[in-house]
Amino acid sequence: MAKKIDGYIKLQVPAGKANPSPPIGPALGQKGVNIMAFCKEFNAATSNQEPGLPIPTEITVYSDKSFTFIMKSPPAAYLLRKAAGIAKGSGTPNTAKVGKVDRAQLEDIVKTKDADLTAADLDAAVRTIAGTARSMGITVEGV
């Protein structure tokens, strides 16, 4: 018989840097999950990724306090900031442009996020990421 699901927890955890301090500890502690076990498993699973890369993680907690987790691809906004070489997006994206990306950089981001995007083809996915870039005040070239 399948385990009974007690709840879900969604967190953005830096790759290789999961530790019991907030926000991870309190979120897992509320559900009674072994915090150190999660931290060790997560850090082992993300050991091959760039340290500090934010990884959206969905943790499924079962009634016996065991857990499983699914890691998604990093947020598009983070990847765009990294590609454009900026610290943060523009406060007024329509008037103040803060960086620039081209189609090749957008295609690299789409390949990174491929599993999480629902676009029908590469061109549609590139346009989706380009829209995110424009809303952050990043100039998009070649799209």
UniProtKB/Swiss-Prot annotation:
Residues passing through the membrane, by range: none
UniProt record, GO biological process: translation
Keyword annotations of the record: Methylation, Ribonucleoprotein, Ribosomal protein, RNA-binding, rRNA-binding
Matching Gene3D superfamilies: Ribosomal protein L11, C-terminal domain (1.10.10.250), Ribosomal protein L11/L12, N-terminal domain (3.30.1550.10)
Recorded GO CC terms: cytosolic large ribosomal subunit
Highest taxon of the lineage: Bacteria
GO MF term set: large ribosomal subunit rRNA binding; structural constituent of ribosome
Processing after translation: One or more lysine residues are methylated.
InterPro entries in UniProt: Ribosomal_uL11, Ribosomal_uL11_bac-typ, Ribosomal_uL11_C, Ribosomal_uL11_C_sf, Ribosomal_uL11_CS, Ribosomal_uL11_N, Ribosomal_uL11_N_sf
Subunit details: Part of the ribosomal stalk of the 50S ribosomal subunit. Interacts with L10 and the large rRNA to form the base of the stalk. L10 forms an elongated spine to which L12 dimers bind in a sequential fashion forming a multimeric L10(L12)X complex.
The protein's role, per its UniProt record: Forms part of the ribosomal stalk which helps the ribosome interact with GTP-bound translation factors.
Family from the record: Belongs to the universal ribosomal protein uL11 family.
Protein known as: Large ribosomal subunit protein uL11
UniProt organism field: Psychrobacter cryohalolentis (strain ATCC BAA-1226 / DSM 17306 / VKM B-2378 / K5)
Organism lineage: Bacteria, Pseudomonadati, Pseudomonadota, Gammaproteobacteria, Moraxellales
Gene of this entry: rplK
